[in-house]
């Protein structure tokens, strides 16, 4: 797997090896996904991912990876949006969110931290 924020680099890599799995890393969810054949998946900052973005990417045969989620509410939103992968510093919490076994309620401090981002 090769990921990059430089789409031209991914195009060059695909020319050299069309079988390599590539991911385009972006801070925002851009339009024009139809023209991004050199990317097999999109890695997007979670705050810019919507359900419609995920549906559109999936309709093109592309996966969506969300980064970097560390709060339960954000993780649940990404699961609800249908992302294929989640990048986190708390994999145990992601597992619990996916399995629906969380026993943690977001604390006021964590909610405040989220609000001040």
Q: Where are the regions a protein language model picked out?
A:
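Short loop-to-alpha-helix "cap/lid" segments that border enzyme active sites
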Residues: 1-117
């Amino acid at each position: 797997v090769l990921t990059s924020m430089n789409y031209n680099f991914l195009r060059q890599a695909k020319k050299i090896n069309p079988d390599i799995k590539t991911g385009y890393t972006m801070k925002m969810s851009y339009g024009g996904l139809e023209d991004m054949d050199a990317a097999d998946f999109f890695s997007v900052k979670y705050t810019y991912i919507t359900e419609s973005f995920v549906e559109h990417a999936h309709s093109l045969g592309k996966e969506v990876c969300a980064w970097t989620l560390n709060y339960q509410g954000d993780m649940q939103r990404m699961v609800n949006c249908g992302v294929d992968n989640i990048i986190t510093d708390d994999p145990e919490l992601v597992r619990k969110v996916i399995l629906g076994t969380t026993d943690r309620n977001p604390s006021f401090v964590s909610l405040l931290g989220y609000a001040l981002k």
